[in-house]
């Protein structure tokens, strides 16, 4: 029997208290709207948490790693072996995401979703392997639909473990040579766009490689057109093991009313699939930054997302999501701690 797909029961956030929440924000000692995007962020968090005092508890960064069959076609400046080497680097604490998580107070967990060769005896690497890299999407489906469902179930268990530990904010990063190709293909399929509008230079490929990358994605979309009857099928045809598990984890986190912080292009592609599966997940998504990958802005617009940062990042790993945490904490803190006009004995600014 094939594994059944996990059912995600995601409630939309309630807007019943919006007037009271907005009034609390507006009566802080500042002109209305003066804290800009932090105010809309505080409103979003207050809707999710439904509490008088907002909080961030045990913020956790999950970095999902997987390899891609299409990488063998030279669509990236780096070979697939670099995925494993970077996972080792994560385990040794030497990557940018390690540095930022230490600085900012994130609990970091790295999940091997299916790199070509597992890292042996690596402390802190969680084994959730779905295979040794996906198939090449321009030649065959990346994986089976049963594999997608297994990845969702694994992701659901992962999120439940962190939720049981008290975590209420989870951020998403990734590592996988070739995964911008998979993400661009997913974007083109779901948003019904030309591949040229979705494909970017990833880690910095030249124009010749960019043309080859675009051609291979076009072949993949043509090959799987009839099979892509829904978002799970899109993942099976075009996805990466890490994108599958990110998608499932976002759905599971929203189901548990956790804050979901989305990193860059790859993580946003996972969010795009998650929203296609259950539109209510969108209420729980906080988009950390606008990356340099050219398709990212289009996806953000499609998801009606206004990212917190725009720093020219194109690294992945969850680095942008990590850097957004102080802003999220600032939104929580001003909401909880900032005096109202009446508290401070100041005449209200109209």
Curated annotation (Swiss-Prot):
- Record CDD domains: DMB-PRT_CobT
Cystine residue pairs: none
GO molecular-function terms, A-Z: nicotinate-nucleotide-dimethylbenzimidazole phosphoribosyltransferase activity
Q: Which reaction does it catalyse?
A: 5,6-dimethylbenzimidazole + nicotinate beta-D-ribonucleotide = alpha-ribazole 5'-phosphate + nicotinate + H(+)
| GO biological process assignments | cobalamin biosynthetic process
Q: Which family does it belong to?
A: Belongs to the CobT family.
What is the name of the protein in this document? Nicotinate-nucleotide--dimethylbenzimidazole phosphoribosyltransferase
Q: What is the lineage of its organism?
A: Bacteria, Pseudomonadati, Pseudomonadota, Gammaproteobacteria, Alteromonadales
């Amino acid at each position: 029997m094939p594994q059944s797909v996990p059912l995600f029961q995601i409630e939309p956030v309630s807007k019943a208290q919006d007037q009271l929440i907005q009034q609390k924000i507006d009566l802080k000692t500042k002109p209305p709207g003066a804290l800009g995007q932090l105010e809309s962020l505080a409103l979003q968090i207050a809707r999710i948490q439904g509490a008088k005092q907002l909080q961030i508890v045990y913020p956790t960064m999950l970095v999902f790693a997987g390899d891609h069959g299409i990488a063998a076609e030279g669509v990236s400046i780096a070979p697939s072996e670099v995925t494993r080497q970077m996972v080792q680097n994560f385990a040794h604490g030497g990557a940018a995401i390690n540095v930022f998580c230490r600085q900012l107070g994130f609990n970091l967990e790295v999940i091997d979703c299916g790199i070509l060769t597992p890292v042996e005896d690596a402390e802190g690497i969680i084994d959730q392997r779905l295979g040794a890299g996906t198939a090449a999407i321009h030649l065959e489906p990346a994986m089976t639909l049963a594999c997608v469902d297994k990845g969702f179930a694994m992701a659901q268990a992962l999120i439940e473990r962190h939720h049981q530990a008290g975590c209420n904010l989870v951020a998403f990063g990734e590592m996988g040579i070739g995964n911008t190709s998979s993400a661009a293909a997913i974007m083109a399929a779901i948003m019904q766009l030309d591949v040229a509008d979705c494909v970017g230079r990833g880690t910095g490929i030249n124009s010749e490689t960019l043309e080859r990358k675009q051609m291979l994605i076009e072949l993949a979309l043509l090959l799987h057109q009839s099979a892509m009857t829904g978002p799970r099928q899109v993942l099976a045809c075009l996805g990466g093991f890490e994108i599958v598990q990110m998608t499932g984890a976002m759905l599971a986190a929203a189901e548990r009313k956790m804050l979901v912080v989305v990193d860059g292009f790859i993580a946003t592609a996972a969010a795009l699939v998650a929203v296609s599966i259950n539109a209510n997940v969108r209420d729980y998504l906080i988009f950390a930054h606008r990356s340099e990958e050219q398709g990212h802005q289009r996806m953000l617009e499609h998801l009606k997302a206004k990212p917190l940062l725009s720093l020219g990042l194109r690294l992945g790993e969850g680095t942008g999501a990590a850097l957004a945490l102080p802003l999220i904490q600032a939104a929580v803190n001003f909401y909880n701690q900032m005096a109202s006009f009446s508290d401070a004995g100041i005449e209200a600014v109209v």
